[in-house]
């Protein structure tokens, strides 16, 4: 623990020393260069390619209309006529009550067995 504290103090001292050294001995930052004058010669752009997939020239030919699809044999709602099974939901109250009763009976039987074994092991 002492080593960690010592290292922390050394690191802080080194950081403080570097910060003070760089601020007192550093040269001032140079001023940014001025923007160059617009002395560029105008170079014409190359002509647009005519035999490439993508070109500068717009292709204004209208796209042909798609043909109407043939109607399906089962009708518009045919995919939804079958009943969807429901896997998530509440169990009927009677089944739920029977389930809890069976669990309670099993716990009671286990408790009675353990009590019976405890009584048999004791001597009066």
Curated annotation (Swiss-Prot):
Stretches assigned to the VM domain: 42-81
PROSITE patterns registered for this protein in UniProt: VM (PS51137)
GO cellular component, as recorded: extracellular space
Location relative to the cell: Secreted
Extent of the signal sequence: 1-19
Source domain of life: Eukaryota
Keyword Glycoprotein: no
GO biological process, one term: vitelline membrane formation involved in chorion-containing eggshell formation
UniProt keyword terms in alphabetical order: Secreted, Signal
Keyword Signal: yes
Pfam families referenced in this protein's UniProt entry, alphabetically: Vitelline_membr
Entry's Gene Ontology molecular function annotations: structural constituent of vitelline membrane
Purpose: Major early eggshell protein.
Family: Belongs to the vitelline membrane family.
Protein name per its UniProtKB record: Vitelline membrane protein Vm32E
């Amino acid at each position: 623990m002492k080593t960690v504290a010592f290292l922390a103090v050394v690191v802080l001292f080194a950081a403080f020393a570097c910060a003070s050294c760089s601020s007192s001995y550093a040269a001032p930052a140079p001023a940014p260069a001025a923007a160059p004058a617009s002395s560029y010669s105008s170079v014409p752009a190359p002509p647009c390619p005519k035999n490439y997939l993508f070109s500068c020239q717009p292709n204004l030919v209208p796209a042909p209309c798609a043909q109407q699809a043939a109607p399906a044999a089962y009708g518009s709602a045919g995919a939804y006529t079958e009943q969807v099974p429901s896997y998530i939901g509440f169990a009927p109250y009677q089944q739920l009550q029977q389930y809890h009763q069976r669990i309670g009976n099993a716990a009671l039987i286990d408790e009675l067995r353990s009590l019976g074994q405890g009584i048999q092991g004791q001597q009066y």
